[in-house]
From Swiss-Prot:
Protein's recorded name: Putative ribose/galactose/methyl galactoside import ATP-binding protein 1
SUPFAM superfamilies, per the entry: P-loop containing nucleoside triphosphate hydrolases (SSF52540)
GO molecular function list: ABC-type D-ribose transporter activity; ATP binding; ATP hydrolysis activity
The ABC transporter domain, residue ranges: 10-245, 256-501
Organism expressing this protein natively: Agrobacterium fabrum (strain C58 / ATCC 33970)
PANTHER family the UniProt entry points to: CARBOHYDRATE TRANSPORT ATP-BINDING PROTEIN MG119-RELATED (PTHR43790), GALACTOFURANOSE TRANSPORTER ATP-BINDING PROTEIN YTFR (PTHR43790:SF9)
CDD domains, sorted: ABC_Carb_Monos_I, ABC_Carb_Monos_II
UniProt key word Translocase: yes
UniProt xrefs under InterPro entries: AAA+_ATPase, ABC_carbohydrate_import_ATPase, ABC_transporter-like_ATP-bd, ABC_transporter-like_CS, P-loop_NTPase
Pfam families referenced in this protein's UniProt entry, alphabetically: ABC_tran (PF00005)
Membrane topology term: Peripheral membrane protein
Annotated residues for binding of ATP: 42-49
Superkingdom in the source lineage: Bacteria
Length: 505
């Protein structure tokens, strides 16, 4: 379909949104045409999520106009926007694990025969939606048994079952492998060809060129620009997003590790998961864990932290062998783990900034009767908000309302207050923007400069190469090589990650 022939599905004019004490959006413009992918880019806190919530009826604008196919509308709820053909696929997928694929696709809209659900029609209708996507998923399969990529396809099928002509996708590739991303992009191209308009939110700017037609950039809640994607470079997008040029993606290291071994493991084994894993971590070192998905990096970190059992091996910290049977044991010894799933494992998402900051060390903010001393409690929270430059209206703000980068900083603050000396960062920049990434990188460098040992688990090789001193490469549950970062490159890391490098000494 030629660009000129595409009809405008959505137009937002002069959209503003105010919350108590905060202007989240100010005079924002946006439009979406049929059969196009229109990306919305901006740092965390730029207003992307607020804009999407206005489109989908979660919020109503304080000012401005929304036109849907030329008609002025204002949706009072997501149910109203869904009924009008607007569907959103959230980064945290919104499915019920113990129900089947078909039941999830038609949840609360099941076809009925009298008072009973028409199971045959439910299954056939769900299969028709899945077939349209070209994916092989059994409609009777329970959602809890699906991969993240398959769950995403179920969400898209659910949108198709609503006859959605506007589809909002929030960080759709953040948890996908490269192969799964290729499949998703094929589905997106097919949806474009059928006339669906897609709003695409992602921090992975490099992959947008494959599917995005236009890009709108927001900064600090304000509209910056809209361009054809082919006419703009990734560097241009980043500069407009952050308001300055980011010539250096990684901070210059301010220190180098000592020769002292702070932490080491020997022969760590968990049967069927990883085997004979040994490595050392020097004082003030950033050690990278690289490898393909499923190589065992996260599993090793979780076992060291006591979250999963070990069948064999030795953990030595400051020259002393540790016995770790639970996360509490690891925390007491000064070992911290920042999970790749920060919302489920790293934060009490419905609690405040202050409560999350002190959660791992409540004894330090309690009086002699074991009751929380709220002055101490709040003083600690304020100290780490200032130290880590956490952007929040107050320490009483609920953490689920903050951006991903600020949530990650709160978790770091929690472990610093606990005086942890070995920190595992598992995919610490997943789903956060380029500006926030740089801030997290700077914090990691500053921790290393204080003599803390940092282990970075990342699927982004430029990140591993830009931050670390050495890199332990995993393949099928084993370390196949430990490489000096200054002397290696992506190609060599991938050889070891694929099992073709020489064995680590």
């Amino acid at each position: 379909m030629a660009r000129a022939e595409r009809s405008v599905l959505l137009r937002l004019e002069n959209i503003s949104k105010e919350f108590p004490g905060v202007k989240a959006l100010s005079n924002v413009h946006f439009d979406l045409r049929s059969g196009e992918v229109h990306a919305v880019c901006g740092e965390n806190g730029a207003g992307k999520s607020t804009l999407m919530k206005i489109i989908s009826g979660v919020y109503q604008p304080s000012e401005g106009t929304i036109l849907h196919k030329g008609e002025k509308v204002q949706y009072a709820s997501p149910l109203q926007s869904e009924a009008a053909g607007i569907a959103i696929i959230h980064q945290e997928l919104n499915l019920v694990p113990h129900l089947s694929v078909a039941e999830n696709i038609y949840l609360a809209r099941e076809p009925r025969r009298g008072f009973l659900v028409d199971r045959k029609k439910l299954r056939l209708d769900a299969k028709r939606c899945l077939d349209r996507l070209g994916v092989d998923i059994n409609p009777d399969q329970l959602v809890r048994s699906l991969s993240v990529a398959q769950c995403q396809m179920v969400e898209i099928a659910k949108a198709l079952s609503l006859d959605a002509e506007v589809l909002i996708m929030d960080e759709p590739t953040s948890s996908l492998t490269e192969q799964e991303t290729r499949l998703l992009f094929k589905v997106i191209r097919d949806l474009k060809a059928s006339g669906v308009g897609i709003v695409y939110i992602s921090h992975r700017l490099d992959e947008m060129a494959e599917i995005v037609d236009r890009v709108t950039i927001l900064r600090d809640g304000r509209y910056i620009s809209t361009d054809d994607f082919a006419s703009i470079t990734v560097d241009d997008i980043v500069t407009r997003m952050v308001g300055r040029s980011l010539e250096d993606k990684f901070p210059e290291r301010t220190s180098r590790p000592t020769d002292d071994i702070l932490f080491s493991v020997e022969g760590l084994t968990r049967n069927g998961v990883f085997s004979d894993v040994s490595f050392s971590l020097r004082r003030g070192e950033i050690l990278g864990f690289a490898g393909l998905m499923g190589a065992g990096r996260t599993e090793v970190a979780r076992a060291i932290f006591g979250a999963d059992p070990l069948d064999a091996g030795k953990i030595v910290f400051n020259g002393r062998e540790l016995s770790i049977g639970s996360p509490q044991d690891a925390i007491e010894e000064g070992i911290a783990y920042l999970s790749e799933d920060r919302k489920s494992d790293g934060l009490a998402i419905k609690m405040s900034v202050a409560a999350n900051t002190t959660l791992a060390n409540l004894g330090e903010v309690s009086n002699r009767f074991g009751l929380i001393d709220f002055k101490k409690h709040d003083d600690v929270a304020k100290r780490y908000v200032d130290l880590l430059n956490i952007r929040t209206p107050s320490i009483d703000q609920t953490v689920r309302l903050l951006s991903g980068g600020n949530q990650q900083k709160i978790i770091i603050g929690k472990w610093l207050f606990r005086q942890s000396r070995v920190l595992f960062f598992d995919e610490p920049t997943r789903g956060i923007d380029v500006g926030a990434k740089f801030a997290i990188y700077k914090i990691m460098d500053e921790l290393a400069a204080q003599g803390i040992g940092v282990i970075l688990i990342s699927s982004e090789l430029p990140e591993i190469l830009g931050l670390t001193d050495r890199i332990a490469v995993f393949h099928q549950g084993r370390i196949t090589g430990v490489l000096e970062t200054a002397k290696t490159n992506q190609e060599e890391i991938m050889r070891y990650a694929s099992g073709y490098g020489r064995a680590a000494q």
